[in-house]
Structures are given as C-alpha cells and as structure tokens.
C-alpha cells in the first residue's frame, strides 16, 4: 500500500509531518514517499507539478497533501502558480468527487459563530463534482469587443458526469442517514436543469435514500439558518466550492476539517480543507487535526480500513475532551498547545 506525501507550502510541511507520525503509529505497513507540489515545486523546478511528482502520484494508491499557495507566488504567470499544481494533479488522477465533512465536535460548540442550539450535533457531508462546470468549460477568456474589455466562461455538464457524482453521493448517503439534498439553480440555468433531471433518474436506483432538491441561493441561507436539516449534499463544482467553505465555518475552525478527492476506483487525494496559512508558517502553532483526520478518510475510502479510521477519529475526540487546543480553537479554560504537542497527544490517545 503506497502513499505519496506532498507537504506543499506554508504550514503544509509541519502538519503533514504530524499526519505521517500517525500513519506510522497504525502499523499497517504503508510505504510512503515524499515529493514536491505547488510553490515548493516551483522554487525547485519551475513547475508546480513536476514530472517526478506526477510519476509518484500515479503509482501511489493514495496521496496526502498539506497545502499549496501563498503570496510569494501570486505575481507569477497563471500556469506557474502553485494552485495550478493542485488542479493538475486532480485532473491527472481523474479525481472527480470531492467529499468534505463539516462536523462540530461538542467540545468546540462555542467556537461556532452560530448559537450552540443551532449547530450542536452538526454532521454534514458535502459531495462536490470537481472536474467539470464553469471552472473547466471552454470557451473562456478575456477579449476586447466593441471597444471594451469582455470576459466570458462556459458552464456545462454531461449526463455521464452528473450520473457518476450522483452515484458517489447516493452511496455516501446510504452509509449515513439516507438523506440526500441535491443543490442546483434549475430555475435559470439549463445545465442544472439537466443536473436535477439526472438526479431524479438516479433516485430510482436508491429507493432507500430520500432525495430532495434545493436552489443554491436557498441552500446557502439554510446552511446558516438551520444546518442540521442536511445530511449529505451534492452539487456542481462552483456551487460546491462556495457551499463547502460556508459549511466549514459553521464548525468554528476550518483547521478541523478534512477532505477527500476520489477517482472512479476510490484512489484519492486527501488534504485539510484549510489553506497554507503562510502568516504562521514555521512557527509550530498550526492545527494538524484536519490533516490527521484526512488520514482517517484515506483509511476509510481508499484502503477500506474502517477500524483504523475510527481509531484516529476517536483519538482526536479524546484529545479535544482533554482540553488541548491549538490557537485557532483555543478558548479560556482550555490548554493551548503547538503543532507537535497536538500530534504527540493524538499519538498518546491512539
């Protein structure tokens, strides 16, 4: 079982180091190899997704990523920016399904910006299509038309693209509370009219899953008004990008949230939902829990090691119950710790 480790930029190397320690502690005989992606790869090779990384990622069963990006590289040509490395590896590995849980741990209820009674017990999974939609549609560009600047993008989805992400979402809902909400904008966008039609057709294959539909503007409002009505949500690339970030902040800290991006065979790229946080890089204060929980997702979805996944998740719960907190989730009455101390505590709980 091979894992490609991509520490990336900013706090990436610090948080992946703790996740690797957790993997090693599981004694599941993983073979791990490290490579460059993002800004670190640009600095070393001039390419955000070098050929050596491409080869290693293709050969691995799973990829663990820290984070990419930072202001240092913002002035580079678009094709050389760190984020192009992330887009490149997603496309190269055929990763079309992004799974992002938004879970509020009881110990962190006060960290949420919403009232505790609104978010207590929150446990949502957002399934986002990753390879289609307006982010990748052609034609796109910037031109001058009729003497003024003109920008354009193209939104499109094929039936097969919608069907395959729909299956991932229905299967995920089947393993949870059997409720799936499909989010679209079918009242004005033909692309999402097709999305809704295909989801309705798929529902016939999953009679044990309750399917509902919601327009994206209403979904954004409902996530803040009454988020616990949702179990699994499925949506397209752009809507999912926005809604998953919104859902993540219901929990109080994006530093707690893992994510998985899967191909058709459950080979996956696993990473924390947060960014590279260059402002705190190298200080040893970043929260490694989202990356550690990403390892739990890796065990569950790619390696079918449910017991290992639960061990990690229970260890994180135990550490939180002990009152240990990194700065992003610290509150009076708890104990502030750094990145390595948090990793030590998770290892001890394991």
Swiss-Prot record:
Signal peptide: none annotated. NAD(+) binds at residues 70-83, 275-287. One of its GO terms (cellular component) is cytosol. InterPro entries: IsoCit/isopropylmalate_DH_CS (IPR019818), IsoPropMal-DH-like_dom (IPR024084), Isopropylmalate_DH (IPR004429). Pathway: Amino-acid biosynthesis; L-leucine biosynthesis; L-leucine from 3-methyl-2-oxobutanoate: step 3/4. It holds the Pfam family Iso_dh. It catalyses: (2R,3S)-3-isopropylmalate + NAD(+) = 4-methyl-2-oxopentanoate + CO2 + NADH. Substrate binds at residues 90, 100, 128, 217. It is found in: Cytoplasm. Binds 1 Mg(2+) or Mn(2+) ion per subunit. The record marks 135, 185 as: Important for catalysis. Mg(2+) binds at residues 217, 241, 245. Homodimer. Belongs to the isocitrate and isopropylmalate dehydrogenases family. LeuB type 1 subfamily. PANTHER family: 3-ISOPROPYLMALATE DEHYDROGENASE. This is 3-isopropylmalate dehydrogenase. It comes from Aromatoleum aromaticum (strain DSM 19018 / LMG 30748 / EbN1) (Azoarcus sp. (strain EbN1)).
């Amino acid at each position: 079982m091979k894992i490609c480790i991509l520490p990336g930029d900013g706090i990436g190397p610090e948080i992946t180091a703790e996740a690797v320690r957790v993997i090693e502690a599981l004694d599941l005989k993983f073979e791990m190899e490290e490579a460059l992606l993002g800004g670190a790869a640009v600095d070393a090779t001039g390419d955000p997704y070098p050929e050596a990384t491409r080869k290693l990622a293709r050969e691995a069963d799973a990829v663990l990523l820290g984070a990419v990006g930072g202001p240092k590289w913002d002035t580079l040509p678009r094709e050389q920016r760190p984020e192009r490395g992330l887009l490149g590896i997603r496309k190269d590995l055929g990763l079309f399904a992004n799974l992002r849980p938004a879970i509020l741990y009881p110990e962190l209820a006060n960290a949420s910006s919403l009232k505790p009674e609104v978010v207590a017990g929150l446990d949502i999974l957002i399934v986002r299509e990753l390879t289609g939609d307006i982010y990748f549609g052609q034609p796109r560009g910037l031109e001058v038309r009729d003497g003024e600047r003109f920008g354009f993008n193209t939104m499109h989805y094929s039936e097969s693209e919608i069907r395959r992400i729909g299956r991932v979402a229905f299967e995920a809902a089947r393993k949870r509370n059997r409720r799936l909400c499909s989010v679209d904008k079918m009242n004005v966008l033909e692309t999402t009219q097709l999305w809704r039609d295909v989801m309705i057709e798929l529902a016939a294959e999953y009679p044990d899953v309750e399917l509902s539909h919601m327009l994206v503007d209403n979904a954004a409002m409902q996530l803040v008004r009454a988020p616990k009505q949702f179990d699994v949500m499925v949506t397209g690339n752009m809507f999912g990008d926005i809604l998953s970030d919104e859902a993540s902040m219901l929990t109080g800290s994006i530093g707690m949230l893992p994510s998985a991006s899967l191909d058709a065979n459950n080979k996956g790229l696993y990473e924390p939902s947060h960014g590279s946080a260059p402002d705190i890089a190298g200080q040893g204060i970043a929260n490694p829990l989202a990356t550690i929980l990403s390892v739990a997702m890796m065990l569950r979805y790619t390696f079918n090691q449910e017991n290992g996944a639960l061990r990690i998740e229970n260890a994180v719960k135990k550490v939180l119950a002990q009152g240990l907190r990194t700065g992003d989730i610290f509150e009076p009455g708890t104990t502030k710790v750094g990145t390595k101390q948090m990793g030590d505590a998770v290892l001890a709980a394991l």
